């Protein structure tokens, strides 16, 4: 098994840690997610990731740094993956689309890489993501196995593109996409713009409720108790 091969830590300790992290990080209890968390443990078992952004970063780093069977080229790393796939996830979210074709992914990402003088081999990139079940087949098309991967890569893209960030914060309204907020704030901790947006939007929603109920914001329902 995985731990026998890589000797992460004592068996029961690994199982306990795996169970705790799956619960704490709100990740689906599936075999592939267990494997991906175990991959993240390879980075440093004693270093508990504080959020899912860090877990996914560890997973991608190990996947693309692996010189074995999962590796398909020497021009791809975790940062290139985030840069390229983040752009494609932007396209998906702008079109409210979850599924896509292999040819569309390759054409769009190849054009993007050429435009930015990026040498990433997008065929290899897609194959690696498919082999690690981050992207899977679905009714003749492709999709991300779990939607949180789209939001993770989209959050990376928001860090690179002010235009896309504005789209997600304004037109798309990320207030209703908590995973976008989670990943955006978890990537590097710099999220003053998101906090400002949340405060503004929550105040606006509160004012709408007060107006419809014809009550003031300082009402205390426990006053007469």
What are these regions, as identified by a protein language model?
Residues 1-161, 170-175:
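Extended hydrophobic
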Residues 160-225:
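Hydrophobic repeat-domain scaffold segments
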């Amino acid at each position: 098994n995985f731990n026998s091969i890589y000797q992460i830590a004592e068996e029961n300790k690994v199982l306990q840690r795996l169970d705790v992290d799956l619960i704490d990080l709100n990740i689906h209890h599936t075999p592939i997610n267990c494997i991906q968390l175990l991959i993240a443990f390879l980075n440093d078992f004693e270093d508990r990731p504080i959020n899912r952004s860090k877990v996914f970063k560890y997973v991608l780093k190990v996947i693309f740094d692996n010189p074995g069977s999962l590796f398909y080229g020497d021009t791809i790393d975790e940062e290139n993956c985030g840069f390229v796939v983040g752009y494609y996830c932007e396209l998906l979210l702008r079109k409210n689309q979850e599924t896509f074709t292999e040819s569309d992914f390759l054409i769009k990402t190849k054009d993007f890489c050429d435009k930015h003088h990026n040498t990433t081999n997008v065929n290899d990139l897609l194959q690696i993501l498919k082999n690690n079940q981050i992207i899977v087949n679905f009714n003749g098309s492709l999709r991300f196995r779990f939607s949180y991967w789209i939001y993770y890569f989209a959050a990376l893209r928001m860090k690179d593109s002010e235009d896309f960030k504005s789209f997600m914060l304004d037109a798309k309204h990320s207030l209703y996409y908590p995973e976008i907020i989670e990943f955006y704030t978890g990537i590097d901790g710099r999220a003053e713009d998101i906090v400002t947006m949340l405060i503004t939007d929550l105040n606006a929603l509160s004012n709408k409720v007060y107006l419809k109920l014809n009550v003031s914001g300082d009402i205390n329902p426990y006053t007469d108790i």
